[in-house]
Amino acid sequence: ILVSSVDQSKASRRVRSACDQGINYFDVAPTYGDAEERLGPALEGIRNQVFLACKTTERSKKGVEQELHRSLKRLRTSHFDLYQLHAMTTQEDLEEVTKPDGALDAFIAARDQGLIRYIGFSAHSAEIAEQLMDQFDFDSVLFPINWVNYFQENFGPGVVKKAEEKGVGRLALKAMARSKWAEGADRSQFPKCWYTPVENE
């Protein structure tokens, strides 16, 4: 569900409606517009009923510490159930987060302090995702998994296999992607989609 760029009452209604229908996993990030500011108030009174995941694009220990506390404050929560390195894409990303005083040092400290329960990452590079799982015992990987990428482009099977071998939880993003947007396609109905979504079964 989308809660950014809408007024608080609409965001809260969407969240409550989702919870009423059994949805209990919510994923947000500072880069998602004002989603943190909208989701925080919407979860008041029901925070203990949901699994709340957040992300950071910061790559240094200090940067993560600062952004983590900002996100906790915006979301009005004492902890995140899952905190993730956001958009791990390049070799430089990998080197930055794993070096001394890199992001992972902050993640480990935050887990020890009870500010986060699980440590994960999101990635759009199969190579980087697999390397990361070899370098650290992550709890989860958030990765594009859909019929088009997986079966037509062979993008994903290696990540899934590595995650299974390492005991890393798999979370799918872009699961409803059908194809890339055609040149000049009308995107007005799906302004926030980076791809043509599946609209029916």
Explain the meaning of each model-derived region.
Residues 18, 26, 39, 52, ...:
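Conserved, mostly hydrophobic/aromatic
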Residues 72-95:
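Active-site groove signature of glycoside hydrolases
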Residues 88-201:
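Beta/alpha (TIM)-barrel catalytic core signal, keyed to glycine-rich beta->alpha loops juxtaposed to Asp/Glu
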Residues 1-10, 53-63, 91-96, 187-199:
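Active-site mouth loops of central-metabolism enzymes
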Residues 5-18, 61-76, 124-133, 201:
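Short, acidic/polar
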Residues 19-20, 39-48, 69-78, 132-136, ...:
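Acidic (Asp/Glu)-rich catalytic clusters
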